[in-house]
A protein has these predicted regions:
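Carbohydrate-binding surfaces of carbohydrate-active enzymes
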Residues: 1-67, 72-196
Length: 196
């Protein structure tokens, strides 16, 4: 844009606008949802809105009971590393013990994933700090005589009974994830350094 008065003054105004938007997102969206959840004795889980819109990627996690991020599989155009880092950091800052991840989202599914590929990515995100995984997505297939089922138009992990490795590796991967999560939820994070 064109600077108003000076570059410094324009930056001050832009910062004020962005801060106002971030605070409004918390006050009129996350806080309202948190209040509704409390009213009905429910827990509130939410993912980060940044960087898809102007917002503070950490600020709204103070309102949620269960912070959540997202990591993607083979989708570099959509994976946002700070999404998981915001969830992990937000949980640590606001004292939340469960850190969830919508995991293995894929934008152009090719049915080439396998448990070894998934485990490596899962381990990386456990190391970042998550301790509860939600698979994105289990493909719905109500038919026993048709394959592959309803795939959400190629978005998401094809984690379902018609996968060629389903009977060879899915249970082992799920059992592994369950054990890791139990241990990670039992423990307490130790963070040696803070970066802001």
């Amino acid at each position: 844009g064109i600077p108003m008065e000076s570059v410094e003054r324009s930056e001050e105004i832009l910062r004020d606008v962005r801060t106002t938007i971030s605070e409004l997102v918390v006050d009129v969206f996350y806080k309202v949802l948190a209040d509704c959840a409390k009213e009905y004795d429910c827990q509130f889980s939410a993912e980060c809105v940044a960087p898809t819109m102007v917002s503070d990627g950490l600020l709204h996690y103070q309102m949620v009971d269960l912070p959540m991020g997202e990591f993607w599989l083979n989708s570099p155009t959509h994976d946002k590393l700070n999404d998981m880092l915001d969830a992990v950091s937000g949980a640590h800052i606001y004292g939340k013990s469960i850190i969830q991840a919508e995991g293995f989202t894929e934008v152009r599914g090719t049915w080439d994933e396998h448990p070894g590929m998934l485990k490596a990515l899962l381990d990386r995100n456990y190391a970042l700090g998550i301790n509860r995984l939600f698979y994105h997505v289990y493909v719905h297939n109500p038919w026993l005589d048709r394959k592959p089922g309803m795939t959400l138009d190629g978005i998401g992990l094809f984690f379902q009974r018609d996968q060629t490795w389903w009977n060879k590796g899915a249970k082992a991967l799920s059992d592994y994830a369950t054990r890791c999560q139990a241990l990670l939820q039992y423990g307490h994070p130790v963070v040696d350094i803070a970066v802001f």
